[in-house]
Curated annotation (Swiss-Prot):
Residues 1-10 have a biased composition (Acidic residues). It comes from Bos taurus (Bovine). Residues 1-94 are annotated as: Disordered. This is Uncharacterized protein C3orf26 homolog. It comes from the Eukaryota. Pfam families: CMS1. PANTHER family: PROTEIN CMSS1 (PTHR24030:SF0).
C-alpha cells in the first residue's frame, strides 16, 4: 500500500475528473469569476472634450432658371386678358345691365323696372368700324336741318360724354367732317371754371357739347344747361385708355353717368324725344 501511494497517483486519474464540477467543488466558480473580471472593461479614461467647431455651409448660387421656377405665379390682370381678347362693341343691353347692377342694392324691384328704357330710344350702336364723324352721319342724317333750326341758348342739340378732358379734345378734332358750321363747346373741368362755361352758354348758341359727366352734371345743377332741347346723347363707350379700361369700367365715371341719367335724361328717353347712342 505504501508503495502504491508513493506513485504519482494523479497522473492515473481519468481526463474528465479534474474538470468536473463535482471534483473541484467551489474552485470552478472561482475560475469563472476571475475570467469575467479579467475580460470586463475598466472605467473609461476621462478625455478632454473639444468644443464643437462652427460649420459654415456654402449655398450654391441661384441661377436664373431656379429663380424662375421658385417665383410665384402672377395673377392674371384684366388688362392682360383684354390685351389678348378681341374687343366687342357695346350694346344697349350692356347699358341696361350696368344700370340695374348699380342700383340693385339700393332700389326695389319696381324701381329697377322703372329704370328700363325702351329699345326705341337707342340709336344703332357702333360696330367698331366707324370713325366718330361717320358714325354721327349715320345715326343723325338730318343734322344740318336740326342745326339750322336750333336757336335756344343755355342748351345743346347733342351731348357727347367721355371719360376725360384729353379724350374730349381728341373727339372734337375727329368730328370735323361731321360738325361743319356747328358750334362746339368743351364741357370739362380742366382749366375751365363752371361759371365761365355758364356765361358762355348764356351768351351764344351751341349745337354740340363734348365733355365729362361730372362737369355736365354741375352745369345742369347750376341752371347753365337745359336738357329739354337735347336730341342726342352719345356715349364714348368702346374707347379704351392705356390700361384698356372703357369709360364705364371706371367706378367714378360710371357713378356720375348714372346720376346724370337720373337728372331728366331717362324721362326724356321714355318720351322718345331723346335718343341714346353708344359709339
Amino acid at each position: 500500500m505504501a508503495d502504491d501511494l508513493g506513485d504519482e497517483w494523479w497522473e492515473n486519474q481519468p481526463a474528465g475528473a479534474a474538470s468536473s464540477p463535482g471534483a473541484s467543488g467551489g474552485e470552478g466558480g472561482g475560475d469563472t469569476e476571475m475570467t469575467q473580471q479579467e475580460t470586463a472593461p475598466g472605467p473609461a479614461l476621462s478625455k478632454k472634450v473639444k468644443p464643437p467647431k462652427e460649420c459654415f455651409l456654402i449655398q450654391p448660387k441661384e441661377t436664373n432658371e431656379d429663380a424662375t421656377k421658385t417665383r410665384k405665379r402672377k395673377k392674371k390682370k384684366i388688362t392682360d386678358i383684354l390685351a389678348k381678347s378681341e374687343p366687342k362693341p357695346g350694346t344697349p343691353e350692356d347699358l341696361q345691365k350696368l344700370m340695374k347692377d348699380y342700383y340693385s342694392s339700393s332700389r326695389s324691384v319696381i324701381e329697377l323696372e322703372e329704370l328700363t328704357l325702351p329699345d326705341s330710344c337707342f340709336l344703332k350702336a357702333n360696330d367698331l368700324t366707324h370713325s366718330l364723324s361717320s358714325y354721327l352721319k349715320e345715326v343723325c342724317p338730318k343734322w344740318v336741318k336740326l342745326r339750322k333750326s336750333h336757336s335756344e341758348k343755355k342748351s345743346v342739340l347733342m351731348l357727347i360724354i367721355c371719360g376725360s378732358a384729353i379724350r374730349a379734345v381728341e373727339l372734337i378734332r375727329s368730328m370735323t367732317a361731321f360738325k361743319g358750321d356747328s358750334k362746339v363747346m368743351k364741357l370739362f373741368a380742366k382749366h375751365i371754371k363752371v361759371q365761365e362755361q355758364v356765361k358762355l352758354l348764356e351768351k351764344r348758341v351751341v349745337h354740340l357739347g363734348v365733355g365729362t359727366p361730372g362737369r355736365i352734371k354741375e352745369l345742369i345743377k347750376q341752371g347753365g344747361l337745359h336738357l329739354n332741347p337735347l336730341k342726342f346723347l352719345i356715349f364714348d363707350w368702346n374707347w379704351r385708355d392705356q390700361k384698356l379700361r372703357r369709360m364705364m369700367d371706371i367706378p367714378e365715371i360710371r357713378k356720375e353717368v348714372f346720376e346724370l341719367l337720373e337728372m331728366g335724361v331717362l324721362n326724356l328717353c321714355k318720351t322718345e324725344s331723346l335718343k341714346l347712342g353708344l359709339f
